[in-house]
Amino acid sequence: MTWSTYSATRTRARPEDVWRLWTDVAGWSRWDDDVASSQLEGPFAVGTGGVLTPRSGPTIRFVLTHVEPMVAFTNRASLPLGTLDFIHTLRTGSGSTVVEHRVEMKGPLTFLFRRLVGAGIARSLPAVVERLGRLAEGGVP
């Protein structure tokens, strides 16, 4: 079973400005209000793990499963019998940058975790992406 949610924003920020914020894992709470703290346990590269503590809920471990500098990255958390992928992508054109965040949940218990965590993620994702875009433009998140 699979569940996903998606949000995007167009910003005047350069891709490297967004990338800098994404790769500053300890600073994720600056643009994501659901994050109390986060840290990466090594370089921003495929296979590196990290820890994220949400404002509500248990601390979760994640691993970077895809890193394409200035273009995209994915961090994956494990769920019982499943996975939770946070997919971040940049697209450029017409003098702007499109910041996309997609969250995909997979596994036989998705029906349960969709209700427990998915609904909150879907609710907050548009504001998270908007704050990231404003911060990348040099504004206040």
Region roles according to the model:
Residues 30, 39-85, 108, 130-141:
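Glycine-rich portal/gate segments that line the openings of hydrophobic small-molecule binding cavities
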Residues 12-16, 65-70, 89-98:
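A short, structured loop/turn motif at beta-sheet edges
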Residues 78-127, 134:
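Beta-strand/loop substructures that line and gate deep hydrophobic ligand-binding cavities in soluble
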Residues 16-19, 126, 130:
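Amphipathic alpha-helical segments that line or abut small-molecule/effector binding pockets
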Residues 1-39:
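Hydrophobic ligand-binding cavity/cleft-lining segments
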Residues 3-5, 58, 71, 84, ...:
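Residues at beta-strand starts and edge strands
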Residues 9-11, 52, 75, 90:
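Short beta-strand element of the conserved SAM-dependent methyltransferase core
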